[in-house]
């Protein structure tokens, strides 16, 4: 592991400029994230991380909440710059004074440098203290005119690896009698389709069995619905991805989650797999006794 090049992103900048959103975005990109690590511990922390065979991307939030430790950040960064197995990138987030004041008023929080005084005084003091760090940052983003979604999109564009599609579609079948999946982003009800449950030889089977699958698929309403559903998903998925989502859960439900929803989930999953990383699961299929 020691010979492997490790990536470190240090997230810093003005309080209220979006560091939490940036950290969450990097976490979604597979980074191991630590908030408010004292800079003096940075070299020791990295020595521990390099021994792990599971962590090669680390993101650390460092700001003036730990002001008593912040003076040590420059020596710590100098030490990292001299370490040949670490690639360090500093992400500095800032915003205009007027925007930062407005954000503090909305949240009714005190500025960490002026807990009992003027928010603007705290902003000015923080901007001065961070000026040197901003000067050595590789990426500076002004979030004054950015919504959180837009910042997530910018972070994704800057840091996602080219060889990995970070957008995953999870297709899940389920039975309405057992409840709608609480983590579903989109839910489709296919109980309007003819039900194989009422055919004796198909009742103990599932939508994974050929007889059931062919029965569900033979109906014109099934084919029309699937054409429209796949077309809808292929149209909307790029926009969900653009919003900064890294995962979209699509749930397809029938009465018991055994026949119709299973067959349609398999079909839709195979269609989506042609363009997106896709996971297919059947939440309630094993509830049937004997399976």
From Swiss-Prot:
Binding site for GTP: 63-66
InterPro entries in the record: P-loop_NTPase, RapZ-like, RapZ-like_N, RapZ_C
GO molecular function: ATP binding; GTP binding
SUPFAM superfamilies xref list: P-loop containing nucleoside triphosphate hydrolases
Paired cysteines (S-S): none
Function: Displays ATPase and GTPase activities.
Stated family: Belongs to the RapZ-like family.
Listed name of the protein: Nucleotide-binding protein Lm4b_02443
């Amino acid at each position: 592991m020691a010979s492997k090049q490790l990536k470190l992103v240090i997230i810093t900048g003005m309080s209220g400029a979006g560091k939490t959103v940036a950290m969450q975005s990097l976490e979604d990109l597979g980074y191991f994230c630590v908030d408010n690590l004292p800079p003096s511990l940075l070299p020791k922390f990295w020595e521990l991380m390099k021994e792990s065979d599971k962590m090669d991307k680390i993101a650390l939030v460092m700001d003036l909440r730990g002001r008593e430790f912040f003076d040590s950040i420059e020596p710590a960064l100098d030490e990292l710059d001299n370490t040949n197995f670490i690639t360090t990138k500093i992400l500095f987030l800032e915003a205009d004074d007027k925007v930062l004041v407005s954000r503090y008023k909305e949240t009714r929080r005190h500025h960490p440098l002026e807990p009992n005084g003027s928010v603007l005084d705290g902003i000015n003091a923080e901007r001065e203290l961070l000026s040197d760090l901003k000067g050595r940052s590789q990426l500076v983003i002004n979030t004054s005119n950015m919504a959180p979604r837009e910042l997530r999109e910018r972070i994704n564009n800057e840091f996602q690896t080219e060889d990995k599609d970070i957008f995953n579609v999870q297709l899940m079948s389920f039975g309405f009698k057992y409840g709608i999946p609480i983590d579903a982003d989109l839910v489709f009800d296919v109980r309007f389709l003819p039900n194989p449950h009422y055919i004796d030889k198909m009742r103990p089977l599932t939508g994974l069995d050929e007889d059931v699958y062919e029965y569900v698929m033979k109906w014109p309403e099934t084919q029309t619905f699937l054409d429209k559903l796949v077309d809808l998903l292929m149209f909307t998925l790029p926009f969900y991805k653009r919003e900064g989502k890294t995962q979209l859960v699509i749930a397809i439900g029938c009465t018991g989650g055994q026949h119709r929803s299973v067959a349609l989930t398999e079909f839709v999953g195979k269609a989506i797999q042609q363009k997106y990383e896709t996971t297919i699961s059947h939440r309630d299929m094993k509830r049937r006794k004997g399976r």
